[in-house]
Amino acid sequence: MKKFPEGFLWGVATASYQIEGSPLADGAGMSIWHTFSHTPGNVKNGDTGDVACDHYNRWKEDIEIIEKIGAKAYRFSISWPRILPEGTGKVNQKGLDFYNRIIDTLLEKNITPFITIYHWDLPFSLQLKGGWANRDIADWFAEYSRVLFENFGDRVKHWITLNEPWVVAIVGHLYGVHAPGMKDIYVAFHTVHNLLRAHAKSVKVFRETVKDGKIGIVFNNGYFEPASEREEDIRAARFMHQFNNYPLFLNPIYRGEYPDLVLEFAREYLPRNYEDDMEEIKQEIDFVGLNYYSGHMVKYDPNSPARVSFVERNLPKTAMGWEIVPEGIYWILKGVKEEYNPQEVYITENGAAFDDVVSEGGKVHDQNRIDYLRAHIEQVWRAIQDGVPLKGYFVWSLLDNFEWAEGYSKRFGIVYVDYNTQKRI
């Protein structure tokens, strides 16, 4: 029997736009995901987050489920436009009330709240001013952060500035698959830089306002393996690791510079005097959050813009088409310790989508998900044995939910949601 350290936190994770529904209720403003999902062609089947899991009305039942399954921590995000409908300025008290109820109920049940300040639902009114491409967003984000710290920081001690900033910048502003749906490499890399500036300003405000809490940031990660021993394939894998994984952001945060292969590729797309901001970006953080789902084999490809292409392997895949590579979570954890040696690390998301069906007995037999989680948790344990200061593990996700551009077609929940009845199974 593998034992995890005393005090290790087992948790579940969600995000506001993916579960809440009622996006405009009680004075909330529109988010970019509201406008993006309401634009035909952006999301599979024309799905939107208008109802989602109706968590806005069923939050109490959902927290009871968290308690029932024995999770000791709950990672959730705050909807920026619920708190500041215009993005800055006037605070919406009803938005604060909603999250206050959630926080107080979690604490009554001895469940530790982990709050993600930004999980992709930017106020639409700020997008009209350029959104993440506007340098002023660092100040807008600091103002929003301050409102949260001042209202919730007395009770919430674990904070995450940004969820997966790479996805915000690249999938939202270069690939155009996520809100705001842009395809501009200059905007994408200005966004990378402004996300780092916003993160740093938020950390600074946190140090002034929350005296005994911890703050970190969360990254998406894939485990990139080279297709051969050839130098150019190894370099391709190194580039993907630096660009797609934690180094793109942790290198500036810990060392005050972008990683070498990223700079080689993207120097011309970054703001002209980006170096001037690096001193401010280099702020101490208390923990690093890592999300991990899948591994990839890559090779050098002279015809691709980044000189890299993916090599498909004959491996089991999830419903997302993602290859299942459990040892990748071990190498990502070991890598972050060796490269940056953070004080604390959390796995802030790990999980899988499968084609879940309700059986005749009214249950969902998701043995494939159980196998996926078990295999990854074994690798997480292995990383702890090798000295990674891992303090907790969060499953993605508590509930089936709005899976961004995939709509409701992909189910990640350890609890099944029947969207016709909102029944939790």
Curated annotation (Swiss-Prot):
It catalyses: Hydrolysis of (1->4)-linkages in (1->4)-beta-D-glucans, to remove successive glucose units; Hydrolysis of terminal, non-reducing beta-D-glucosyl residues with release of beta-D-glucose. It comes from Thermotoga neapolitana. One of its GO terms (biological process) is cellulose catabolic process. The active site is at E164, E349. Broad substrate specificity glycosidase. Releases glucose from soluble glucooligomers, with a preference for longer oligomers; acts more readily on cellotetraose than on cellobiose. Displays similar activities towards the disaccharides lactose and cellobiose. Is also able to hydrolyze various aryl-beta-glycosides in vitro. Gene3D superfamilies: Glycosidases. Belongs to the glycosyl hydrolase 1 family. This is 1,4-beta-D-glucan glucohydrolase. Its EC number is 3.2.1.74, 3.2.1.21. GO terms for molecular function: glucan 1,4-beta-glucosidase activity. InterPro entries: Glyco_hydro_1 (IPR001360), Glyco_hydro_1_AS (IPR018120), Glyco_hydro_1_beta-glucosidase (IPR017736), Glyco_hydro_1_N_CS (IPR033132), Glycoside_hydrolase_SF (IPR017853). Monomer. Keywords: Carbohydrate metabolism, Cellulose degradation, Glycosidase, Hydrolase, Polysaccharide degradation. The lineage of its organism: Bacteria, Thermotogati, Thermotogota, Thermotogae, Thermotogales. SUPFAM superfamilies: (Trans)glycosidases.
